[in-house]
Amino acid sequence: MKSAIVSCLIGLTFIFFSCKKDDVNENNNGETNNENLNLDCSYENNNVSKTFDCNVQLEIESVFFETISNDTRTFTVNNIPSHSVGEFPNNANPHSISAQDETIEINLHPQEAGNLTPLQSSNGPAYAFGICLNGVEMDPVAAEPWGKNTSNENYDWNLEATANSLGLDCSNAHVQPNGAYHYHGTPVKYIEKLNPPANEMVLMGWAADGFPVYYSYGYSSANDNTSEVKSLKSSYRLKSGNRPGDGISAPCGEYNGKYVQDYEYVEGLGDLDEANGRTGVTPEFPNGTYYYVVTDEFPGIPRYFVGTPSKDFKLGPN
């Protein structure tokens, strides 16, 4: 899952990429991706994100089967969406979409673990988040540390995929070197196909730990399914001030959302917890469950698990 060549500055070429299970590094040329270390800090305020129109209808049929047996929910998928996609390869993502052949298992009866498991480790992406009901995986963390492929590589500062030019299409998705199409942020075209009514919660997928994933909306009173449905808000915000880095070992410049670490979680700021979820009733779980929410604002796709993630969503050697 599990990249992309963008032009670069000051004579350097660098590569943007996300991650996949067997090889989280999508960089085919072994070049550094971060802007010239030692650049003026004002450069870090240039937050450039470009997405490509979704004007291509794939000829490959989408495959998604779900079965339940004992304590396991099993998906058989090919990672091909049923919605239109961007043009791949493109000038920032040199890979073509191809069908995968995957069988994925998650816990049918998940339990909260008592501690959070991050999708990103100190060495890079550790897990993909989950799978949508069209068989495409949600994989929000990019393998884009500060100083990548240099002695200053620093995953304490990792580029936010949706805020940088990674060759994403209008559904915030792009393609791995192995051909796997995957979402880094709100899967716009998929949500359009779900066509969620404004007054209903709509299940959009399952997280790697087995808990359900909904898009944006939930009951205004978490445990009352007769209460008004509203757009649920994340409890993250941009930090104020400037990054503490020196521009060599870590980035400097004003916090502007270019890096994941430009954001901070503030308990109670919104409706959702640090994992971008909450406990409450849903149409599928009238007695209540923990559930995650994909929001249009950061973090979009959640960055933590409250339960124990399936090994089928593990990325790379982390």
Residue ranges and their predicted role:
Residues D156, A161-N195:
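Aromatic- and glycine-enriched beta-alpha-beta binding-site module
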Residues L133-S171, D246-R278:
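Short, flexible domain-boundary/linker segments around small modular repeats
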Residues K2-I10:
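Sec-dependent signal peptide recognition
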Residues I106, C132-V136, P177-Y190, F285-P299:
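Extracellular/lumenal glycan-associated surfaces
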Residues D209-F211, S216-P317:
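Extended, compositionally biased non-globular segments
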Residues D101-T103, A126-A128, L168, N178-H182, ...:
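Extracellular structured ligand-interaction cores
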